[in-house]
Swiss-Prot record:
EC assignment: 2.3.2.27
One Gene Ontology CC term in the entry: host cell nucleus
Main location: host cell
Biased composition range(s): Polar residues: 1-11
Biological function: RING-finger E3 ubiquitin ligase that plays an important regulatory role during the initial stages of infection. Migrates to specific nuclear foci early in infection supposely to prepare the sites for viral replication by targeting and ubiquitinating host proteins.
The name this protein goes by in its record: E3 ubiquitin-protein ligase IE2
Lineage: Viruses, Viruses incertae sedis, Naldaviricetes, Lefavirales, Baculoviridae
ZnF (RING-type) intervals: 179-227
Species, as recorded: Choristoneura fumiferana nuclear polyhedrosis virus (CfMNPV)
Family to which the UniProt record says this protein belongs: Belongs to the alphabaculovirus IE2 protein family.
Length: 348
C-alpha cells in the first residue's frame, strides 16, 4: 500500500525527472546580463503614487536618498539628479542638436527634390495659349497639391477658351503676292491661306505652278534665289502646314487637257458676276471721261469770254454815246453766248 502511494506521488515523478535530465551551463561571458527589474514592493509603491511621481521615478539620476541637485526636461520628460551623480547636460544638448540637424537636412532634401521635379515638369510642358508675361517662367506651381476636380475644371476652362477663340472670325484682308519666277500676282487672304510653296531650308516662296515645273526636271527642289537644295517643301494655311515630298513625275501631255476638261465641267461658275463687274468698270470709266470733257469745255468758254472783253475795251475810245451803246450791245451778246456755252456743258 505504501509502495503504491509513493509511486503515485508527484514528488517521486519530479525526482525521477531530475535524475534523467542533463543540465548544461554556458560560460559567464556568453550569458547576457539581465536587465534590472523592480521588486514587487517597489512596483506596488510606484502604482500607489500619482502619475506625475511615477513618471519622475523613471527619470531619476543618482541615489534618491540624497538631496535633489538638478531638474530639467528633455523630450517632454522630466529628469531629476540627486547628489553628486556623474551627469553632464551637454550630452542631452548634443543629442538634441544632432536630431534637429538631421530633421532639417531631411526637410531640405525633400524641398530640393520637389523643386527639381516641378522645374522638369514646367520645362517639358508646352506653353498655354493664354500665357501672360506677368507670370515668370521660374514661378513654382504646386500642381501636385490640386485635387482631380480642380484639374478637371482648369482643363475645361482652357478648352472652352480655345473654342471661343476659334469661334470669333478673324478679319479677312486680300493681299496680292508676287512670284519671282513667273512674275504673276496671286490674291490670297492674309494669315488664312497661301498659294505659294515654301522650302523648309531657306523659307523662300514660289507659286505652285513654278514648283511643279521645277520638280519635273529635278529630284530635289533647288531655290531660284539662294540655290539651296531641299527634299521637302511646305504649303501653309490657317490650320498649319503640309510637307510636300515628291515621289514620282510622269510626263504626259494629254493629262493637262483631261484635267482642264474636268475643271470646265465641274468647277466653272454659272453666275454672271464677272460680266457685271466688267459693266460696272466701263460705266465708271465713262463717267470719268464725261467729267473731263465738261471741265475742258468750261475752260474754253472762259477763255473766249476773256478775249471778247479785251477787244471791247480796246474799241471804247471813239465817242461816249456810240461807245456806250456798242459796249452794251456787245456785252449783252457776249453774256448770252456765255450762258449758251454753260448750258451746253451741263447737258453733257
Amino acid at each position: 500500500m505504501s509502495r503504491q502511494i509513493n509511486a503515485n506521488t508527484p514528488v517521486s515523478r519530479r525526482r525521477s525527472g531530475l535524475r534523467g535530465r542533463r543540465l548544461s551551463y554556458s560560460p559567464e561571458d556568453a550569458v547576457p546580463t539581465p536587465a534590472p527589474r523592480f521588486s514587487i514592493l517597489e512596483a506596488r509603491r510606484a502604482a500607489d503614487r500619482p502619475a506625475e511621481e511615477r513618471m519622475r521615478a523613471w527619470h531619476v539620476i543618482g541615489d534618491t536618498s540624497e538631496p535633489v541637485t538638478l531638474r530639467f526636461v528633455h523630450n517632454n520628460a522630466q529628469y531629476t539628479v540627486h547628489g553628486n551623480a556623474p551627469f553632464n547636460t551637454a550630452d542631452f544638448q548634443e543629442e538634441r542638436d544632432s536630431q534637429e540637424t538631421e530633421a532639417a537636412n531631411r526637410a531640405h532634401q525633400r524641398a530640393v527634390h520637389l523643386h527639381e521635379h516641378l522645374h522638369e515638369v514646367q520645362e517639358t510642358a508646352a506653353p498655354l495659349p493664354n500665357y501672360s508675361p506677368v507670370h515668370s517662367p521660374d514661378l513654382t506651381v504646386m500642381e501636385d497639391l490640386e485635387t482631380p476636380r480642380q484639374r478637371f475644371e482648369t482643363m475645361f476652362h482652357a478648352v472652352d477658351a480655345e473654342s471661343e477663340d476659334e469661334a470669333v472670325p478673324l478679319p479677312q484682308v486680300d493681299m496680292a503676292v508676287f512670284c519671282h519666277i513667273c512674275s504673276c500676282f496671286f490674291t490670297d487672304i492674309k494669315n488664312y491661306n497661301s498659294s505659294f510653296v515654301t522650302t523648309s531650308e531657306c523659307n523662300h516662296a514660289v507659286c505652285f505652278k513654278c514648283y511643279t515645273s521645277i520638280m519635273f526636271d529635278k529630284e530635289l527642289f533647288k531655290c531660284s534665289m539662294c540655290n539651296r537644295a531641299t527634299p521637302t517643301c511646305r504649303v501653309y494655311n490657317h490650320k498649319g502646314f503640309v510637307e510636300l515630298l515628291p515621289t514620282r513625275a510622269v510626263r504626259d501631255k494629254q493629262a493637262i487637257k483631261t484635267h482642264w476638261a474636268q475643271l470646265l465641267d465641274n468647277n466653272m461658275s454659272d453666275s454672271k458676276v464677272p460680266e457685271q463687274n466688267d459693266v460696272q468698270k466701263l460705266q465708271a470709266e465713262l463717267a470719268e471721261l464725261r467729267a473731263e470733257m465738261a471741265s475742258m469745255r468750261a475752260e474754253m468758254a472762259s477763255k473766249q469770254l476773256g478775249a471778247t472783253m479785251a477787244l471791247e475795251n480796246r474799241r471804247g475810245s471813239s465817242s461816249s454815246g456810240a461807245s456806250s451803246s456798242s459796249t452794251s450791245t456787245s456785252s449783252s451778246s457776249s453774256s448770252s453766248w456765255l450762258w449758251e456755252c454753260l448750258l451746253n456743258t451741263r447737258n453733257y
